[in-house]
Amino acid sequence: MLYPTPIAKLIDSYSKLPGIGIKTATRLAFYTIGMSADDVNEFAKNLLSAKRELTYCSICGRLTDDDPCSICTDPTRDQTTILVLEDSRDVAAMENIQEYHGLYHVLHGLISPMNGISPDDINLKSLMTRLMDSEVSEVIVATNATADGEATSMYLSRLLKPAGIKVTRLARGLAVGADIEYADEVTLLRAIENRTEL
């Protein structure tokens, strides 16, 4: 169906979001058009504000509005342990269980030979720099239980073990193919408590 240009452009914008197909994009566009002008303005203001005010922590790579982030600057955190994650959303999932008290490092992706993503394409160099200048004795690899997550964890293990750093992996309990972001708190707690050395 042909829609007026402003609606078609809005549908196109929504359809660029991950997981949003054309039907959902159309529903969102029409819902947005039906919102009050004040609500649309607030939505637009919040979207622009988030884009403008958020940055990545220069230490851990987590999405934050402070640099360095509040976790990296918290002196009560365990400075000897770093939990390595794929995405900033995974940090929030781990923080929700309130049992991990160490530091984080966000890779912003995983090694994926099939997709042409090499170790140089993810946030590994800053992790190595961090480890050289710190008292870290353990790195917990908390990548998703996928082929790319496994490839990344094995690469980190081979890279860090010769440096005398203990490398562990979250225990199974996370289903193969599952995303950490969507795991419940009990599953995450058991996974971190029962992590295994690589």
Curated annotation (Swiss-Prot):
BP term (GO), one: recombinational repair
InterPro entries, per database record: DNA_Rcmb_RecR (IPR000093), Rcmb_RecR (IPR023627), Rcmb_RecR_Znf (IPR015967), TOPRIM_dom (IPR006171), TOPRIM_RecR (IPR034137)
One Pfam family here: RecR_HhH
Disruption phenotype: Mutant is sensitive to the alkylating agent methyl methanesulfonate and the DNA cross-linking agent mitomycin C.
Keyword Ligase: no
Superkingdom to which the source organism belongs: Bacteria
Start-end of C4-type zinc fingers: 57-72
NCBIfam families in the cross-refs: recR
Family to which the UniProt record says this protein belongs: Belongs to the RecR family.
Name by which UniProt lists this protein: Recombination protein RecR
